[in-house]
């Protein structure tokens, strides 16, 4: 099985590898020119990023340019990348709108609507559905060129700590 996965990866890299870096650089330049800023990330998210962010009319928006490292064995964006992007962007927005209170995901419902392709620019525009003293309910659609590819709803618990 591992040989099959390695073989599929090698074939995809050969087909898609040439010019991939230029495509990523072009997407990054487009994001910068549209007012996006790089988000400093650490830990697991650092492996998936770079992540981009901007605020438009008070609403937080996030972008991720999909690269070869995000592919599954079918050459499409791996579902875990899409889930992580939805979770992280909902969590970041919840953190900002709550006055930077610490929080943790307690539930994330994810619906895959369409496949993401390597080279796509994923966009997430999370919104608060409801907030209580201990929980905040978030929702987002992950889009590519205004087409919804993922719908996600998350529940986040506020943690004790600096408020």
Predicted regions and their residues:
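Terminal targeting signals and extreme-terminal segments of soluble enzymes
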Residues: 1-163
């Amino acid at each position: 099985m591992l040989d099959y996965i390695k073989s599929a990866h090698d074939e995809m890299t050969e087909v898609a590898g040439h010019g991939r870096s230029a495509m990523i650089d072009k997407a990054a330049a487009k994001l910068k020119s549209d007012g996006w800023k790089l988000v400093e990330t650490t830990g697991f998210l650092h492996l998936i990023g770079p992540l981009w962010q901007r605020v438009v009319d008070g609403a937080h928006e996030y972008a991720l340019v999909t690269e070869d490292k995000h592919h599954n064995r079918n050459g499409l964006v791996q579902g875990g990348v899409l889930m992580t992007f939805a979770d992280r962007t909902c969590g970041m927005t919840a953190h900002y709108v709550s006055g930077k209170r610490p929080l943790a995901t307690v539930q994330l419902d994810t619906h895959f609507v369409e496949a993401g392709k390597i080279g796509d620019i994923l966009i997430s525009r999370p919104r608060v559905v409801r907030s209580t003293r201990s929980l905040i309910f978030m929702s987002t659609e992950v889009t590519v060129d205004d087409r919804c590819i993922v719908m996600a709803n998350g529940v986040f618990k506020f943690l004790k700590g600096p408020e």
